[in-house]
Amino acid sequence: MFLSNIPGDVRANEQLNLIAMHTIWMREHNRVARSLLFNNPAWLDDRLYEEARRIVIAEYQHIIFNEWLPLIVGTDLMQKFGLFPLTSGHSDLYLDTFDPRVSNEFATAAFRFGHSLIPSTFSKIAGTGARSGSSGSLNMKDIFFKPREFMVNKGNFFQK
């Protein structure tokens, strides 16, 4: 039996982490869109989509700046450059005219270090969160572009 996600980008089925992240963020987008529709029933689909997209991007950026980036660059640099999110209130620093693109040099060289953060082995876990043991391990090389394991196991994996 062949099971697959049908994402907008074929790379989404490349490995379990990507499948999980794409699924989580797609579901969050849809959850936000439903909430916006409930509170704004006159909004058209395009507006619902774009507003939900804007909110989910902000959520993603908050996680990046609050949890991931401090681990990568360290808290000293985060503090030095004022990169930590506010603990209360809001910032007026957002500029919709700011160009958020990444340079080709950064995208093709410097940021590729992130590939070294991808684990080579995943352990299956039970619905309770308990590991299934060594027989329940999956090697990245065996599941590359094979989303079946994710679909069959409903995303129950633990990175080693």
Question: Which residues fall in each region the model found?
Answer:
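Long, well-ordered alpha/beta core segments of mature domains
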Residues: 1-160
